[in-house]
């Protein structure tokens, strides 16, 4: 069996210089006799001969690193540890060896413990340079990394001295992952309010560092029944009320309880490799800084630690016991396959030993190997495999990333490992994350079901699942969405059913019932959906057995009290005017929602022409770009994000001031979740709807479902600025349309030309989109575009919000000059709306004494 090829292995050089991958040539290559009749057809006339090597030794890479690789090893980042320990053990007695240690750039890392693990401890074999071979893929990665780190440099750096261990460790600090969640500095808060809710002590410590002094209402009502009584929970609360911690803390408690019940005693063997003991004991022994650095990494930047898991060690033991010493020569990676003698170094001829001596040497080697493997098998038994204990299902990828980061922040002192499985990212990297056997997995249904079908060993047995969480459950179980979820729930409730499993279901619109469409109501045998019927249907789809505890903290309006709702009635073509007016008049962190991706792309091009650089977020974007745009939107104070309903649910973006519904959502649930991106955690926020003629029907449905007692107020717009706004939008539309058509035509024509060149055919002018443009027409179009852009640039250079003033003397244009009068920065959209409300409340009080006059005259 051959090791899995890894990135850390150096590539074979094209020169004729021989290289060794852990094999030392003792004898000579012997020619293999082949029957010449086998090559009678003449297809292998260039073949010279076949050679085989039977007399060789296994060389320890750690003993002679200079003879392993002839070229400079690739640089790798690692945590540095001093090499002085090896010198104290007497491994580097010669001064030449000490010089090599000083030259090495990367000092021995934590992975040196795993490197020592595979060295033969017999001094006789040690002198001969024999070594063991690891058959496990991940262990192979570890050893190859260590070999690369100890490889010497070709060039001598005379002026540079070796860094001390403290300096090297301080220089290499792990990079913090980018995220849109605000960083909370270590500030200890009083968490006495959490103690009555049966929160574990490590979680209390993390809550203190995060500054969460008191639980939110949904957390206070959920934690005790979920942790103490172990009840299934159906939780409904407003957006931004802390539902993530309401299900994260009970899940962490369930994992900790399982670890206590299945805790294994530490291994008695003091010489056990640190890489093995760290897998289980590391949950309690590693420092909080390491746990935080490990958990804060995004899926894209996650680096798998070089640790040998129990399952990996068992595979390694099976591989070693199954093969002899001679067979292990073939296990040194795929780079040696088919290369023959070119992969080895021909050293000085060594006198050939007798056959009896060779047999004795082989017996000693195999005996030492078996003894070491027996010790490892005992270590494997001491540490059982960690099953999957917690599973969180979310509808969107961004929400899954956010939930994982929240869980990692709360579980930073518990040692619990988490993993994320979402689409749009590398499947192989997520498989490596699952190889670490995390206790908690946060996933979207599609990628999770894909890995389950591939029968990953960590996802095979879901009967041991202790906690199942379905976030945004009403969206997850909607008909026509997430087909994989129904198959997954069916499997969990049938073949993988666990009666001890706890199910937690949360959403902001869990109990919100909207009216069904007319085409469904007119059908026979249709029942009106109410709150109880919706919950029963939800429980049936998820497979919850028994009576769960229902916690409903939503208002009748379903929105937050601190949210201010407003609207603007306009024509469809006028939506661009009011959107541009609002973004220019009230700058800040604004989130604009639309129902379609095409609308998002058109708005993005239009605003870019107007010197507003918006960020976009929709389903057709690459996942890395989606996460990058979210992070940038949370970092910039004055920024615009154009998004579809992908960003409507669950995202906790800090300090979003305005949510603008460019197109009215189709259902009331989407409206509640869109508006919930602002006014989070007792902060104020504004929700603005641009209502066109085609949006009136959806607006009335939302107004009726949310049971609004008062009419939504109109947003105040200063009409004196609209003429300038319309002129800018008119020019921007012409430029955007022309550029879009030209781009589409060039894209289509380029594809047609490439296809014709591949087929070797000639194209006709009719096949070009818009016809094949002449040079004169193209020059005329470009000249027209320059004129439009120059005119728009002139308008954009002038201030938009100005006030006219009277002058004593006539002007050249015959019009009064416009002087700049910028609005005060302290005046926000919320303050303008509140002023308008105060004016309306004062007006009806003035004409009250005049009302009884008509009644007296009638008498």
UniProtKB/Swiss-Prot annotation:
The keyword Hydrolase applies. There is a cross-link at residues 370, 624, 808, 825 (Glycyl lysine isopeptide (Lys-Gly) (interchain with G-Cter in SUMO2)). The modification N6-acetyllysine is found at residues 17, 71. SMART domains: DEXDc (SM00487), HELICc (SM00490). GO terms for cellular component: cytoplasm; membrane; nucleolus. Residues 578-723 form the Helicase C-terminal domain. Its main location: cytoplasm. The modification Phosphothreonine is found at residue 302. Residues 224-528 form the Helicase ATP-binding domain. InterPro entries: DEAD/DEAH_box_helicase_dom (IPR011545), Helicase_ATP-bd (IPR014001), Helicase_C-like (IPR001650), P-loop_NTPase (IPR027417), RNA-helicase_DEAD-box_CS (IPR000629), RNA_helicase_DEAD_Q_motif (IPR014014). A motif (DEAD box) lies at residues 471-474. It is found in: Cytoplasm; Nucleus. Its EC number is 3.6.4.13. Belongs to the DEAD box helicase family. DDX24/MAK5 subfamily. This is ATP-dependent RNA helicase DDX24. It comes from Homo sapiens (Human).
């Amino acid at each position: 069996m051959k090791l899995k090829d890894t990135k850390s292995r150096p590539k074979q050089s094209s020169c004729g210089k021989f290289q060794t991958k852990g094999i030392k040539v003792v004898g000579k290559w012997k020619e293999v006799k082949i029957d010449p009749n086998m090559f009678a057809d003449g297809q292998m006339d260039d073949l010279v001969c076949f050679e085989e090597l039977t007399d060789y030794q296994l060389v320890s890479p750690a003993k002679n690193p200079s003879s392993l690789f002839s070229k400079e090893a690739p640089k790798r980042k690692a945590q540095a540890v001093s090499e002085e320990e090896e010198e104290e053990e007497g491994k580097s007695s010669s001064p030449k060896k000490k010089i090599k240690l000083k030259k090495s750039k990367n000092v021995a890392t934590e992975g040196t413990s795993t490197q020592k693990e595979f060295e033969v401890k017999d001094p006789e074999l040690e002198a001969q340079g024999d070594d063991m071979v690891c058959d496990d893929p991940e262990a192979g990665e570890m050893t190859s990394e260590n070999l690369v780190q100890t490889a010497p440099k070709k060039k001598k750096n005379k002026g540079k001295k070796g860094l001390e261990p403290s300096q090297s460790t301080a220089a290499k600090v792990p990079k913090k992952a980018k995220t849109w969640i605000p960083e909370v500095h270590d500030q200890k808060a009083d968490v006495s309010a959490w103690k009555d809710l049966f929160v574990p002590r490590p979680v209390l410590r993390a809550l203190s560092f995060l500054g969460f002094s008191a639980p939110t209402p949904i957390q206070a009502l959920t934690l005790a029944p979920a942790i103490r009584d172990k009840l299934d929970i159906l939780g409904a609360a407003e957006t931004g009320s802390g539902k993530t911690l309401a299900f994260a803390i009970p899940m962490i408690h369930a994992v900790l309880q399982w670890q206590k019940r299945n805790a294994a005693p530490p291994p008695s063997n003091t010489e056990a490799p640190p890489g093995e003991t760290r897998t289980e004991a590391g949950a309690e022994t590693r420092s909080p800084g390491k746990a935080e650095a490990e958990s804060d990494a995004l899926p894209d930047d996650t680096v798998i630690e070089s640790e040998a898991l129990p399952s990996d060690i068992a595979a390694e033991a099976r591989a070693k016991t199954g093969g002899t010493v001679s067979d292990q020569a073939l296990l040194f990676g795929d780079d040696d396959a088919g290369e023959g003698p070119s992969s080895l170094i021909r050293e000085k001829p060594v006198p050939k030993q007798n056959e009896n001596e060779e047999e004795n040497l082989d017996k000693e080697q195999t005996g030492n190997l078996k003894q070491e493997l027996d010790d490892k098998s005992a270590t494997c038994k001491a540490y059982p495999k960690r099953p999957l204990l917690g599973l969180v299902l979310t509808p969107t990828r961004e929400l899954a990333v956010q939930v994982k980061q929240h869980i990692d922040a709360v579980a930073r002192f518990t040692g619990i490992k988490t993993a994320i499985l979402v689409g749009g990212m590398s499947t192989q990297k997520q498989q490596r994350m699952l190889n670490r056997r995390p206790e908690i997995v946060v996933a979207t249904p599609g990628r999770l079901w894909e890995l389950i079908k591939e029968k990953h060993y960590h996802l095979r047995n879901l009967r041991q699942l202790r906690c199942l969480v379905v976030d945004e459950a009403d969206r997850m179980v909607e008909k026509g969405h997430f087909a994989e979820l129904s198959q997954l729930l069916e499997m969990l409730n049938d073949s993988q059913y666990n009666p001890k499993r706890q199910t937690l279901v949360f959403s902001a619109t869990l109990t919100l019932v909207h009216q069904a469409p007319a085409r469904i109501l007119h059908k026979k045998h249709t029942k009106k959906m109410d709150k109880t019927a919706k919950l029963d249907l939800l429980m049936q789809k998820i497979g919850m057995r028994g009576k769960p505890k229902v916690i409903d903290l939503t208002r009748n309006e379903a929105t937050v009290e601190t949210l201010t709702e407003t609207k603007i009635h306009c024509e469809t073509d006028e939506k661009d005017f009011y959107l541009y007016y609002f973004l220019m008049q009230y700058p800040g962190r604004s989130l604009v929602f639309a129902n379609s991706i095409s609308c998002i792309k058109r708005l993005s091009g239009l605003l870019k022409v107007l010197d507003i650089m918006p960020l976009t977020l929709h389903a057709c974007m690459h996942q890395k770009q989606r996460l990058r745009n979210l992070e940038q939107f949370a970092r910039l104070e004055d920024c615009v994000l154009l998004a579809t309903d992908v960003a409507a649910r669950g995202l906790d973006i800090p300090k979003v001031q305005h949510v603008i519904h460019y197109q009215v959502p189709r259902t009331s649930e989407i409206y509640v979740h869109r508006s919930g991106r602002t006014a989070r955690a007792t902060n104020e926020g504004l929700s603005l709807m641009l209502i066109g003629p085609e949006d009136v029907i959806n607006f009335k449905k939302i107004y009726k479902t949310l049971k609004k007692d008062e009419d939504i107020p109109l947003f105040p717009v200063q009409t004196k600025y609209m003429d300038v706004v319309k002129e800018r939008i008119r020019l921007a539309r012409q430029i955007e349309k022309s550029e879009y058509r030209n781009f589409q035509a060039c894209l289509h024509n380029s594809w047609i030309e490439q296809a014709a060149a591949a087929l070797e055919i000639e194209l006709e002018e009719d096949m070009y989109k818009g016809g094949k443009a002449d040079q004169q027409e193209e020059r005329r179009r470009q000249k027209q575009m320059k004129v439009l852009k120059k005119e728009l640039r002139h308008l954009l250079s002038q201030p938009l919000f100005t006030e006219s003033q009277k002058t004593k003397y006539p002007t050249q244009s015959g019009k009064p000059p416009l002087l700049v009068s910028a609005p005060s920065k302290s005046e926000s959209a919320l303050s303008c709306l509140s002023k308008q409300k105060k004016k309306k409340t004062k007006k009806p009080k003035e004409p009250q004494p005049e009302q009884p006059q008509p009644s007296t005259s009638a008498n």
